[in-house]
């Protein structure tokens, strides 16, 4: 099951988690304090940084399928991360907004290359689909070890070395992942699809460079003009879904039904990640404004590092969830992916219910203890691990092989759309520059917002359970269609 190749890839995944989430956690204060952005604009930029990268997984999936292959795409992605973080170093040192935006634009595009390529290549390092499905949640936890350390340590690190020092460390970590990809190149290429084993033509390299330049320029424009940028995200996401539907309509009946289930699961994933996106935007802003004290009285936690509690619990959740579902399957108890997403919404409703209670009952000191955020992230993280690991495995299990990478990129489209929608929602609780936080603001503005999210999470539980029934019927119909074709071929 485990071998040198998938272990090496998990090292790269950890380096990604350390560097990317380390950058993300310090971006909020970097834009608020060094670049003098207000709360609303800061939440939009940080939300977009978490969202636009997955959006360009559309291009990443196309590039991996048609031009470069998964291995080359992933290797170039780590080069892009290292280069983007290096630009952030220069932007922070010179307090240069355009250079900083260019850095996060390049890192966002690199994430777009990585998102569809990593699971596709990682899957090929296992002998069976079952081994891959059982081990993918472990990989998710490895990513979260990196994310935990990055999100917890970077806020304290920048107090010593400054923002430019934090960005420099991220560049070095991304560089380490790049070196590892080069070190195990031979083994990964042998395990890869045929496209990775063939040389790339000059024409394809030129097309890749041209497309990449255009995409990076577009991302920079979107970060510089977020009002227009969010509409571009909606348009690109919508176009990707329309293109997928067009492919679905041209497919045979069995493939069409399977692709239809991917659309349903993409909708559920989008709704879930609207909640996940609050962690980087509204929940971080609430923590900065209200969270005070050490965790359990002795563990120092910077307010913006509260989101580090998420990967902490995700790291714990991965093996537990894998163990629970494996034991249930041995007892012949099987839940569909949509039903599992429904379980995630139950956990999400509990998490936001706790947050709603915390802000509506806050005292005159406007203080919320770190332990409250720890409890919130416990429930949210378990839901995230279910969606983050199970949905990708489901898509890979039903997607036609010739559009496998593009199908996986729909998962990233869901993250992108939800990230922007969630960031837009979050701006409703943003304070003006210099506005003082009060008990009334926390109880009413924050309270009403999180109460609405809690109610909607409960509604989504019912929708997910209904979707589970529909998906089951569609997959049964797809199987029947395949059997009919096989029977006709056998009789002809």
Residue ranges and their predicted role:
Residues 133-152, 158, 173-177, 181, ...:
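Glycine-rich segments within core transmembrane alpha-helices of 12-TM secondary carriers
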Residues 57-94:
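Conserved MFS/SLC helix-loop-helix module at the cytosolic interface between two early adjacent transmembrane helices
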Residues 113-127, 386-399:
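Intracellular juxtamembrane helix-capping segments at the cytosolic ends
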Residues 79-95, 343-365:
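C-terminal ends and interior cores of transmembrane alpha-helices
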Residues 25-41, 279-305:
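Short amphipathic helix-loop junctions that connect adjacent transmembrane helices
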Residues 1-4, 154, 158-284, 288-294, ...:
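Intracellular loop-helix junctions on the cytosolic face of multi-pass helical membrane proteins
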Residues 47-64, 308-321, 417:
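Central cavity-lining transmembrane alpha-helices of secondary-active solute carriers
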Residues 66-79, 327-346:
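Cytoplasmic membrane-interface "Motif A"-like loop-to-helix N-cap segments
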């Amino acid at each position: 099951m485990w071998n040198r190749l998938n272990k090496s890839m998990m090292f790269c995944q950890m380096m990604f988690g350390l560097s990317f989430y380390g950058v993300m956690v310090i971006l909020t204060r970097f834009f608020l304090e060094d670049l003098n952005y207000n709360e609303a604009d800061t939440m939009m930029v940080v939300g977009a940084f978490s969202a636009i990268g997955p959006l360009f997984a559309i291009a990443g999936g196309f590039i991996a399928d048609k031009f470069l292959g998964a291995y080359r795409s992933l290797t170039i992605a780590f080069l892009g991360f290292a280069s983007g973080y290096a630009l952030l170093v220069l932007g922070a040192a010179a307090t240069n907004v355009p250079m900083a935006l260019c850095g996060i634009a390049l890192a966002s595009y690199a994430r777009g290359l990585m998102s569809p390529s990593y699971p596709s290549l990682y899957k090929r390092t296992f002998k069976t689909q079952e081994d891959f499905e059982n081990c993918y949640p472990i990989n998710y936890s490895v990513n979260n070890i990196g994310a935990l350390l990055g999100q917890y340590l970077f806020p304290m690190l920048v107090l010593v070395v400054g923002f430019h020092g934090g960005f420099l460390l991220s560049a070095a970590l991304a560089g380490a992942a790049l070196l590892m990809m080069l070190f195990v190149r031979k083994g990964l290429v042998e395990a890869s699809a045929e496209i990775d084993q063939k040389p790339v033509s000059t024409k394809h390299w030129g097309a890749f460079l041209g497309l990449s330049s255009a995409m990076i320029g577009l991302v920079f424009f979107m970060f510089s003009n977020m009002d227009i940028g969010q509409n571009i995200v909606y348009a690109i996401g919508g176009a990707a879904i329309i293109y997928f539907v067009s492919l679905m309509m041209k497919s045979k009946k069995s493939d069409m039904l399977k692709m239809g289930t991917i659309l349903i699961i993409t909708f559920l994933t989008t709704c879930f990640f609207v909640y996940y996106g609050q962690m980087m935007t509204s929940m971080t802003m609430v923590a900065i404004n209200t969270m005070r004290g050490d965790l359990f009285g002795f563990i120092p936690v910077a307010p913006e590092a509260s989101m580090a509690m998420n990967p902490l619990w995700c790291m714990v959740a991965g093996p537990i969830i894998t163990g629970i579902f494996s034991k249930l399957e041995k007892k012949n108890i099987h839940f569909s992916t949509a039903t599992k997403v429904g379980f995630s919404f139950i956990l999400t409703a509990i998490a936001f219910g706790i947050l709603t209670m915390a802000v509506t009952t806050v005292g005159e000191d406007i203080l919320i203890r770190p332990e409250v955020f720890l409890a919130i992230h416990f429930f949210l993280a378990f839901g995230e691990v279910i969606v983050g690991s199970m949905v990708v495995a489901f898509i890979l299990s039903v997607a036609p092989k010739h559009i496998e990478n593009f199908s996986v990129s729909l998962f990233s489209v869901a993250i992108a759309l939800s990230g922007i929608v969630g960031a837009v929602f979050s701006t409703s609780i943003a304070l003006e520059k210099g506005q003082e936080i009060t008990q009334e603001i926390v109880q009413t503005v924050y309270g009403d917002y999180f109460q609405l999210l809690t109610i909607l999470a409960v509604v989504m539980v019912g929708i997910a359970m209904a979707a589970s029934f529909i998906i089951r019927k569609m997959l049964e119909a797809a199987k029947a269609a395949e059997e009919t074709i096989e029977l006709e071929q056998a009789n002809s």
